[in-house]
Every structure is written in C-alpha cells, then in structure tokens.
C-alpha cells in the first residue's frame, strides 16, 4: 500500500458523504457522462481480453462494463469502501494513483477516470500520469478524465443560483485559480483547460494525445431540465444532447462547454522499463 494520502476532505467526501456510483446512474447528466465515456473509450481500447488497470476506479462502475466486454480488469482506489464494493466486480486494492502497486509494462490500458480531479498540485498530477505510463506496456493506451475549467459556471446556472453572492464569488474563484477548496458542497478539486490536459499527458511521455468533451456542449440544458418540476428531461432532449456531443468532436473551440474532458494517449513503442 502507498504511503501517500489524499487530502482528508477528499477521503471524507468519498468515504462518508457521496455515493459516486449512484451519481453516474441516477442523474441525467451522470448517465450521459457514463455512456459517452464508454463510447469514447471503446474507440481506442485494444481487443479483449486485454489487461486494464482502472486507477481511481471507485466502486467499479467502469470496471463493470469492461469486464462484460471481456477485458481483464484490476482496480486501484484510495477509498476502502470503494474497494470493498469493487471487489465484487474485479480484483481491487487500496492504493494511490501517484504510487501504483504494479510492475512496469504490465497493462494494455491504464485509465484514470477521476484521480486528476482531486490533485490540485501539478507535481501530483504529473506523478500520477507518469505512474500510469510506467505500468502501461509500450504501445499501450492511457486515458485520463478531467473536470472542465468552466464546468461550475454552467452547472450553477442550471441550479438558478449563480447570481447569488456566495455562489458567484465561489465560481469566480474557480475560474480564476482552477481550484475549489472544498469548503462547501463539493470537495477539493482541480479544473482543467483542454490544452493543459494535452500538455500534462505529453509531459508524461505519451504520444498521439487527443482530448474529447465527454458530455458535449448541451449537457447543461439537460441538467437544467432535470431541476424543473415534473418528469425531468425528455428522452428526445437527452438524445439530442448526446448527438451534440458527437457532432462537437471535430471542433476544439467547443471543448470548453463540456462538463468533463477525456484525454487519450499511447505509450511509445520501444520504451520498456522507463520511468518518466
């Protein structure tokens, strides 16, 4: 087990406060995030049965569909209750993205669909990406998700309270600093710009880095509809928002409107035994 520890507020948030599994299954924008993440990853995944390391994999919500697709999945997460739940899906251990308990050149795919969210120190993010690159095989895939720099701006409009002084000031600080201190509601978090994510993956030695908007530019319309009295967003609205996410992919200027970003890159061939 790693001696590194996440910020106590992050551990409390995921260990005691929030159910990350239900977030991606119950809310409309959460379901969009889950389906689009599957859709994007399946474009780049090698054929099953390849070996996948799910770093920060939570309760195994992504491991679950990967196992069903025929992949051999191992999961690492810092939160013990997540690991306990994920163990019903695949082998799972407590560990930290910055110090993975795995040998070099072991996995065909390493995915970090959460760890970068809660590492505001760039040195920590670089260490996590370097570890992902280390344990991936030459030619292997590394995929990393990030919260978009502007996500909170769109989100708090959907709740119709961005104009209140406290929320306005809080979101303004996130836009200025890219960091939320976790003082209320959400926990300590970092918010990426797309070009920054490309730079960070490249600095870890990855090649052919590409970034996608996961939910696309219309997710906040779906979330706003869900806040209104009644039955929530229609299937037609969700389908249109999903189509908008796909249509937006060729246009990098639309990345800033997505709630989350997904970056993919490959480990250079001939780099066995490296440690960035």
Which residue ranges define each predicted feature?
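Conserved class I S-adenosyl-L-methionine
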Residues: 1-48, 61, 65, 85, 141-174
């Amino acid at each position: 087990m790693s001696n590194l520890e996440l910020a106590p507020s992050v551990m409390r948030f995921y260990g005691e406060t929030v159910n990350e599994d239900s977030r991606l299954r119950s809310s409309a924008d959460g379901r969009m995030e889950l389906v689009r993440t599957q859709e994007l990853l399946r474009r780049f995944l090698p054929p099953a049965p390849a070996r996948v390391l799910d770093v920060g994999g939570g309760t195994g919500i992504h491991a679950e569909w990967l196992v069903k697709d025929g992949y051999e999945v191992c999961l690492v997460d810092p939160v013990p209750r997540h690991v306990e739940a994920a163990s019903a899906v695949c082998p799972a251990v407590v560990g930290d993205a910055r110090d993975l308990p795995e040998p070099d050149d072991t996995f065909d795919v390493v995915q970090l669909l959460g760890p970068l969210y809660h590492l505001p120190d760039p040195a920590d993010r670089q260490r996590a990406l370097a570890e992902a690159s280390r344990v991936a095989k030459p030619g292997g895939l590394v995929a990393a998700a990030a919260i978009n720099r502007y996500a909170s701006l769109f989100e708090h409009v959907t709740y119709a309270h961005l104009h209140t002084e406290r929320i306005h000031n809080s979101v303004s600080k996130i836009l200025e600093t890219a960091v939320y201190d976790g003082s209320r509601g959400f926990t300590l978090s970092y918010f990426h710009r797309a070009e920054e994510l490309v730079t960070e993956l490249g600095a870890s030695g990855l090649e052919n880095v590409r970034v996608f908007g996961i939910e696309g530019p219309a997710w906040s319309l779906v979330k706003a509809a869900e806040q209104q009295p009644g039955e929530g967003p229609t299937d037609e609205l969700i389908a249109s928002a999903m189509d908008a996410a796909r249509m937006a992919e060729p246009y990098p200027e639309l990345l800033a409107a997505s709630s989350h970003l997904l970056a993919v890159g490959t480990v250079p061939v001939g780099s066995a035994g490296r440690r960035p």
